[in-house]
Amino acid sequence: MGTHASPNVLLVVLDSVRAANCSLYDAARETTPYLSRLADESTVYTQARAPSNWSLPSHVSLFTGLDAHVHQVTVHDRLRAGHTVFEALAADGYATGLFSENGFLTGRDAGLADPFETVVGVPDDYDDRYDTTVLDPGPDGFYYADRVLAWSAEVDGPWAACLNLMDAHRPFEPREAYDRWGDDRARTIQADLPIRWEWAFYGGDRPYWQLGALESLYDGGIRQADAVLEHVLESLRSRGALDETLVVVCGDHGDGFGEPGRVPGEPPAVSHILPMHEELLHVPLVVRPPGGATGERVDELAALTRFPAVARAHARGDPPSRGFTVDRALALKQPVTADLRERFERRCDPVEPYLEPSRAVYENAPDTSGAVRKHSYWGDTGVTTLVHAPGVVEHREPIEPETVDRAFRDGNDRDGGDDRDPVREPLAGRQPDADVEAQLAALGYY
């Protein structure tokens, strides 16, 4: 199994989905029944880590295989051509497609859409059956699922696609069939909040307990994303294409609902972009190779940055023995700059705890079965923790931030250092499209 030459490649990104809230990883709510069934014919990674705590840097890392501190792409930059796995696959004869509501992928001039021949973002008009939200002006994930299915059915030859599903991204508006844990109070709390709600909590306007109500809606969003995934994969199965496809399902980052910091001075986790908690970095990762697998669960450390190497190896018909496992994984929080920094300065007093730099290094813990070590810092304070499972974290000992920074320097040198071809280029004053910015604002990015 898994040795087909030139299989299709399907990367399904469950945007904002954290491992701790997936029933696949023993979450109390049955949020991922299909993913749990898919696990029986796949490889499940129990200790997978995202390279950053929000979509833009994580997707650049997913597409290029470069850690976030290496590519350094922020909202002020764009990814230069020639660095992604999808361009490499296109050169090998693959048709390529990108399907997502996330404007950082399909709308904004970030360079992430450029590698793809077909790009489907938020449409001007769409069928009412996809119009299931009030706060979010775009269609739900079933729209993008149907677009990737229609596109792949017309491709003559191998194809490679990224389907990014935003059903579990704020605002949380799952269809009634999947909204199993939310209630009127939760929906009212969300409706009364600004869509970018970090400052309502960090600034003291709202109590942190209200985030628990939002989490009940978030879990419904995960359940809906799971149903969209089922629709896509079972449709491929019914047409005989699933066994000809490498399927990689992952979260690009998680989300925060008031979890306390584990480093002294670290604020509670609220949403994403700022927090570096495990709830933001520990993500689901399920890989179904062509022909299926045997339901193996891998407890070693795994990194999303392995996707390009894994995809290219499968395309050659030579799957890598290590899969997504790594000896070390790196994750970072990008600097809080420009408008985002100004908003924190206006709403938070003191503001300094929210602006601190943060990095994390993960390593396997061979002396503790199934666990990984996390060395991280927030500002000038660092700690080592032992992560046994999603949401199960044991504090170990304080460390110096330099211990973490040294690992990042080693990683940069390993990836070519200053001699490496530039991956990014500045936007240099180019103004974003107003419609794209409005759509991103509706998703809580501004």
Annotated model-derived regions:
Residues 1-446:
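Catalytic domains that recognize anionic headgroups
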